[in-house]
A protein has these predicted regions:
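Glycine-rich, proline-tolerant flexible connector loops at the mouths of alpha/beta enzymes
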Residues: 39-58, 110
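Active-site acidic/histidine proton-transfer and metal-coordination neighborhood
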Residues: 3, 24-25, 31, 37, ...
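Vicinal oxygen chelate
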Residues: 44-47, 74, 212-215
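Alpha-helix boundary/capping detector
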Residues: 56-57, 86-88, 115-116, 257-258, ...
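Generic hydrophobic, helix-prone segments enriched in Leu/Val/Ile
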Residues: 53-54, 67, 135, 215, ...
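Histidine-acidic metal/acid-base catalytic patches
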Residues: 2-15, 19-36, 90, 153-272
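Catalytic-core regions built around general acid/base machinery
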Residues: 52-63, 120-131, 189, 226-230
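Short glycine-rich, flexible loops that bind phosphorylated cofactors or substrates
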Residues: 47, 106, 209
Length: 272
C-alpha cells in the first residue's frame, strides 16, 4: 500500500464567495463545511477597521475554527491606498495581500473593464512588500474582453512580466478559471510561475471560452486533478480559495459539493 504524502497547501475559501452574506453566516458555513482558511474581503472587515474591531473579528473567526490567510482582492489606485492595504494586512496578521494595482483608462473611465494595470504603482507596492515583509499576489482577470479585463493583468504571464524584476514578495494570485478560458493549461502555468505563486482561486466553468461561466467545481471543464497535482509537485505552501460568487447563493449546494470534490482530489494526489 502506498503511503500518502502530506500536501503542503490547504483548501480555503475566497471571501468574495460570500459577498451577499454576513460575517456570522459566512463563518457558520465554513465551520459546517470544515473549512478553516479564509481570504478576507473588506465587506466582512472594512479597511478602516480599528484595532479593537480587528481584534473582535479575529476572535469571532477563531471561535468558528477559521484563520484569515490573506486579504483581498484589494484594488489600489494610489500609494496611499496601497499603504492602507498593507497596514490592514499587518494589523490582521496575514502574510499576503491579494492586490490589484490599477490606473484609469486614457479616457478616464474607471469601470472594472476600463481599469488598466499600473506597473508604476507596482514598483511602489514592491517597496512596501520589503518594508512590511508581506507578499502581494496580483489577481489575473482574463484576456478575453467579452468576459474579463485584459488590460488589468489578464493572464498570469501578464503579472509575471510586471513583477519578475521586483521584490521577491511580488507575485501572482492565479484565477484558474480565467487562466483556462484564455487557452492556457493551468497546471503548466503553475509549474512555470511557481516561484511567485502566492494564492490560487479555484473556480470551474461550464463554457471553456468564458471565464465567467460559473458551475460547481466537480462538473466544469477544467481538469482540477492536474491542477492539484501541479501544486503538490511544486511544493506550493499557500491556500487555495474556492470561489463561486457568480453562481452562489442561487446554487447553495455547489459549496459543499466543491469542498468535497477538492478534498477528494487532494486525497487522490496525496495517495499518488
Amino acid at each position: 500500500m502506498t503511503t500518502p504524502r502530506s500536501l503542503p497547501f490547504r483548501l480555503g475559501m475566497a471571501g468574495y464567495t460570500y459577498h451577499k452574506f454576513s460575517l456570522d453566516e459566512t463563518l457558520a458555513a465554513l465551520e459546517r463545511f470544515d473549512v478553516h482558511d479564509l481570504c478576507v474581503k473588506d465587506f466582512h472587515l472594512p479597511l478602516t477597521s480599528t484595532a479593537e474591531q480587528i481584534a473582535a473579528f479575529k476572535k469571532k473567526c477563531a471561535d468558528h475554527g477559521v484563520t484569515p490567510y490573506g486579504v483581498g482582492p484589494i484594488y489600489m489606485q494610489t500609494e496611499d491606498e496601497a499603504k492602507r492595504a498593507f497596514d490592514y494586512a499587518a494589523a490582521l496578521g496575514v502574510p499576503v495581500v491579494v492586490g490589484v494595482p490599477w490606473k484609469p483608462a486614457a479616457d478616464g473611465g474607471k469601470g472594472w473593464k476600463q481599469r488598466r494595470q499600473s506597473p508604476e504603482l507596482c514598483a511602489k507596492v514592491s517597496d512596501l512588500c520589503a518594508k512590511y515583509d508581506i507578499k502581494v499576489a496580483i489577481h489575473n482577470h482574463g484576456r478575453n474582453p467579452a468576459t474579463g479585463a485584459p488590460a488589468l493583468f489578464g493572464a498570469p504571464a501578464d503579472v509575471w512580466e510586471v513583477v519578475k524584476g521586483m521584490d521577491r514578495r511580488m507575485g501572482i494570485c492565479m484565477d484558474i478559471a480565467y487562466t483556462f478560458a484564455d487557452g492556457f493549461d493551468p497546471a503548466a502555468e503553475i509549474r512555470k510561475y511557481a516561484s511567485r505563486l502566492f494564492d490560487c482561486h479555484f473556480r470551474n466553468i461550464s463554457d471553456p471560452a468564458n471565464g465567467s461561466s460559473g458551475t460547481d467545481s466537480a462538473n466544469g471543464k477544467i481538469n482540477y486533478y492536474n491542477v492539484v497535482k501541479a501544486l503538490a509537485d511544486v511544493g506550493y505552501e499557500g491556500a487555495c480559495g474556492i470561489e463561486l460568487a457568480n453562481a452562489f447563493p442561487k446554487n447553495p449546494d455547489w459549496i459543499p459539493a466543491s469542498v468535497g470534490y477538492f478534498r477528494a482530489l487532494m486525497d487522490a494526489v496525496a495517495r499518488g
